[in-house]
Amino acid sequence: MAIIITKQTPVIVQGISGRIGQFHAADMIRYGTNVVGGVTPGKGGSQVLDRPVFNTVREAVEATGAEASLVFVPPPFAADAIMEAADAGIRTAVCVTDGIPSQDMMKVKRFLRRYPEDRKMRLVGPNCAGVISPGQGFLGIMPPHIYMAGRVGIVGRSGTLGYEAASQMKALGIGVSTSVGIGGDPINGSSFKDILALFEADPDTDAVMMIGEIGGPQEAEAAAWVRDHMTKPVVAYIAGLSAPKGRKMGHAGAIISAFGESAQEKVEILSAAGITVAPNPSSMGETMARVLSLRAAA
């Protein structure tokens, strides 16, 4: 079992006819992801990568039974693409697009909130690397060869640090059940808490690697949730220990603007909740290996 995507999940790509969308769709197909079609307005009736292209998401869902969508749509139009997917009945959308205006994402969040829980679409991103369940499929832009199938979940705001964690663990013989990049924007679809809850309920995940960074309250909120609800061990790493206050560091959401948003404060909050924090990025895999060995010996 995996969370969010399995080998059977039927996937469409919004923006499949564009250069970037086509490149990553081809990568997903080679890996074995069940890509059943794509959507590009005005290109309906054509084919890309031997998959049918539709004018609208609703047409694609009705024709293919698609349940998940990967959104490769330029920032000015990405919010409308996400809302179109939700309205068409897509269950999970992963948005890779960077630079979506915060006001547009606020509109998306309000739009998604109107749906009842049994019909609400799960949004991962934007500005994220995507989701991969090794050996089954992926929705995103990550290099799939660095992931080995296993029983540790990864969730992080930084895509490249997620790659690094997976690579380090693979070198130590530790595999991944599912890796989720939630994105680095200040307003995103799924939080650490949302993904941690999925991993907690997943019988094929034994532990979780959580990768945070400066800015925002998500890590502190996740720490409280882990303390009160999580039965599986969580290892964390927080990027930005040397980041100055008030300066954006890479991601739009990576800026220290309030108490509790610096890396050091987040490390203290996570540690107080019983989470093991890796001291630097090169020790993420070793820290997870140590936690797993202690759990096995208990």
Q: Whereabouts are the PLM-identified features?
A:
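Catalytic-core regions of core metabolic enzymes
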Residues: 1-298
